[in-house]
């Protein structure tokens, strides 16, 4: 198995690199302290109404109360703080639900107030298409989502970003290139019955090029069908992922084996 060979090449103090762990991310992060350069992930958006079944994922039930969801997110960011190397970033793709438009803002506010992280940037991701909001007389069709760039509060002026120097002033002060906080990328790499809420390899590749370097270790706490890992292989980054669904882990491994064995197909 090609992906098994890739895993065996590298370990971080006994933990396999380039592997998706079929477990809760809070368990994985206990073994990753201080080893990760960046987190790139898209959490469940908590868009399913309580007592409603059958949307989004094959295992996870995306229907917490607002308070439960916020507390859960705070616990996850405590884990991120423990695993990130100095000046590492969290790139957190999140959007709001049609019926719960405030949760996203509540989460961000509590992260800033109650965690060691602050919001460094907001990237707008324009997707190629959007489902028309034909049932609403007053809500717009949403064709954008957001990637929230979080850094530690103590590293607001030093967190990793790959902006290059375009010129240097007489005083020695560098001028950096102009990089817009706007990315156009595909919606996804085709959703599956296992996970209807995936993002695209194209989006993740652009984020990797902005915030990581070749050989960096990237962690995805909600790996799903392996999109972050897929992008990492292309851009020569190492990855570790967590995923609750055994079936999604199996799907991702098959997908990544194809990526490794037949890169010319992509």
Task: Label every model-predicted segment.
Residues 253-266:
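Class I S-adenosyl-L-methionine-dependent methyltransferase module
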Residues 2-6, 10-251, 265:
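Core catalytic lobe of class I
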């Amino acid at each position: 198995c090609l992906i098994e060979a890739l895993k065996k090449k590298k370990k971080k103090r006994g933990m396999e690199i380039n592997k998706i762990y079929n477990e809760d991310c809070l368990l994985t992060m206990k073994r990753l302290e201080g080893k990760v350069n960046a987190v790139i992930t898209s959490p469940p958006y908590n868009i399913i109404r309580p007592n409603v079944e059958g949307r989004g994922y094959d295992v996870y039930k995306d229907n917490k109360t607002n308070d439960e969801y916020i507390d859960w997110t705070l616990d996850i960011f405590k884990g991120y703080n423990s695993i990130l190397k100095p000046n590492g970033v969290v790139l957190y793709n999140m959007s709001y639900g049609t019926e719960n438009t405030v949760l996203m803002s509540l989460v961000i506010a509590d992260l800033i107030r109650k965690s060691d992280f602050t919001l460094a940037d907001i990237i707008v991701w324009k997707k190629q298409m959007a489902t028309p909001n034909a049932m609403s007389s007053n809500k717009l069709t949403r064709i954008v989502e957001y990637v929230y760039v979080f850094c530690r509060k103590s590293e607001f002026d030093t967190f990793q970003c790959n902006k290059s120097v375009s010129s240097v002033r007489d005083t020695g002060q560098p001028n950096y290139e102009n990089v817009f906080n706007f990315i156009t990328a595909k919606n996804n790499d085709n959703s599956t019955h296992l996970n209807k809420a995936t993002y695209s390899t194209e989006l993740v590749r652009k984020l990797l090029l902005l915030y990581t370097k070749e050989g960096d270790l990237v962690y995805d706490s909600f790996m799903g069908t392996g999109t972050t890992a897929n992008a990492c292989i292309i851009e020569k980054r190492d990855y570790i992922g967590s995923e609750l669904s055994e079936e999604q882990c199996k799907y991702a491994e098959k997908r990544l084996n194809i990526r490794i064995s037949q890169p010319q197909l992509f």
